[in-house]
Amino acid sequence: MSQNREQLMEELSTNVFAMFRTLRNDIGKIFGGYIPWNEFIVLRILNRANKEMVSRVANELNVSNSHITAVTEKLINKGFVTRSRSTSDRRVVYLEITEQGKDLVAKMEGAKKQYLQERFSALSEDEMNIMISISKKLI
């Protein structure tokens, strides 16, 4: 491997990590006035599905059922989610987003969209497509 390639890989990895850190920190600040990121992700899934089993949410996020239970307990206490048990199988627990939760997701998605529009305004559509293509190769 050439020394130039090694330098390029080092610079690329540094830039990618810096980009992700910046995006994560900025989104965290934007969402800080609402709810934490992990709660938002669960709400977003429930907003899409409206009602979902705890196990399916956990599988989609690749986390344990107990983690989802802990996160949703906070969302329930805030009035964003309700929990119910299946009438046919008491082991099955469903989560459902409330109207208040739907409103919050809409506000947060709007704030995120505005941030991303500003953040990526320096890139053309072609440049964004190139970045998407490259990032898919690395994932």
Name these PLM-found stretches.
Residues 32-35, 67-70, 74, 124:
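Short glycine/proline-centered loop/turn elements that form peptide/ligand docking sites
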Residues 18, 41-44, 103, 130:
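Pre-recognition alpha-helix immediately N-terminal to the DNA-recognition helix
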Residues 44-48, 109, 136:
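Short, locally clustered residues in the helix-turn-helix/winged-helix DNA-binding domain
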Residues 74-129:
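Charged, amphipathic alpha-helical coiled-coil/dimerization segments
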Residues 1-7, 11, 125-139:
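C-terminal regulatory/oligomerization modules of transcriptional regulators
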Residues 1-33:
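N-terminal leader segment of winged-helix/HTH proteins
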Residues 49-93:
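Canonical helix-turn-helix DNA-binding module
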Residues 24-64:
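N-terminal helix-turn-helix DNA-binding core of bacterial DNA-binding proteins
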